[in-house]
Amino acid sequence: MAFKIASSPHVTRNLHTSTVMQRVILCLLPGLVVQCAFFGWGTLVQVLLAILVALSCEAAVMKLRNRNIKASLSDNSAMLTAILIGVAIPPLAPWWMIVMGTAFAIVIVKHLYGGLGHNLFNPAMAAYVLLLVSFPVQMTTWIAPSTVALHSPSLVESLQLIFNVGAHVNMEQFRLGIDGMTMATPLDTLKTDLSMGLTTTESLTKAIFDGSTGVGWFWVNLAYLAGGLVLLKLKAIRWHISTGVLLGLFVASSIGFLLSPDTQASPLMHLFSGATMLAAFFIATDPVTAATSPRGRIIFGALIGVLVYIIRTKGGYPDAFAFAVLLANLCAPFIDYYVRPRTYGHSTS
């Protein structure tokens, strides 16, 4: 075997922040496209509105801090935060909610603590929790996927509903069901049915489910999984956190399902419903708010996965990734303190 010997210096090229953010955004696109295909133009409108607000807030804060506005906007961190918020909230949520959430994420969560690299919590998830706690009805009102809905809002109708101007139908009609079914996510529907005494098998016979997963949500999660795998291939993220999240959720949900299959969702449904793949590859992997060591990252991810299962099954919210990520952010310094790599030349860290 022939080896090519190159002269020194052997310099490796580090990825700039803007390059990493660009790769993450590009890998988000498959999931965004599939989500728009199933849930309409509203998702795209929310994303574009969030980007506009995020860039405006970023520029305003940089101006107040006498920092370089162009450099801050070009690192793409504000745009990524905006996209994550835009895909997380319901497609037809009122415009002022995405404005409020995005402004809170950029101004308070990110810049109040010093800007990029200094925030204690994931900005997108902090904004999501703020909106969910403040406006639970609007944040849990989803339209039915296009494959089962008798009427999906067009681009014009989506704009009218989001901005509440001149719409021939209102959000209440979509919520009550133009298509004759409740507008709730599969996880929310299953949780409600179980609380009413139905079994998992009985609940899964509803039109919003497709076998063992929710209609549309399986393909949305599959698209985000594909994007996440590309992200790993590009080395924009490391595998530890994503693996920890999925493994923690899979093990916890498998134990629950084996112990009580009539009252628990299957591991497949937990993995391919809600924001599982989006959170595992694009949210939990935020390097600023996560643990730093390889073992610490696995523990950090597994903690998120277990917390998601606990909150989904025992808590008041059907999808719990935002709460799980924020709680894990709180634990990250603790994990880093006790899970440190061994110092070279010493038997202990």
From Swiss-Prot:
Its main location: membrane. It is an enzyme of class 7 (translocase). Its EC number is 7.-.-.-. The keyword Transmembrane helix applies. Its cofactor is FMN. It is found in: Cell inner membrane. It is a multi-pass membrane protein. The chain crosses the membrane at residues 20-42, 77-99, 124-144, 212-232, 239-259, 265-285, 291-311, 315-335. Disulfide bonds: none annotated. Pfam families: NQR2_RnfD_RnfE. The modification FMN phosphoryl threonine is found at T185. Keywords: Cell inner membrane, Cell membrane, Electron transport, Flavoprotein, FMN, Membrane, Phosphoprotein, Translocase, Transmembrane, Transmembrane helix, Transport. One of its GO terms (biological process) is electron transport chain. GO terms for cellular component: plasma membrane. Belongs to the NqrB/RnfD family. Part of a membrane-bound complex that couples electron transfer with translocation of ions across the membrane. HAMAP family: RsxD_RnfD. The complex is composed of six subunits: RnfA, RnfB, RnfC, RnfD, RnfE and RnfG. This is Ion-translocating oxidoreductase complex subunit D. It comes from Shewanella baltica (strain OS195). The gene is rnfD.
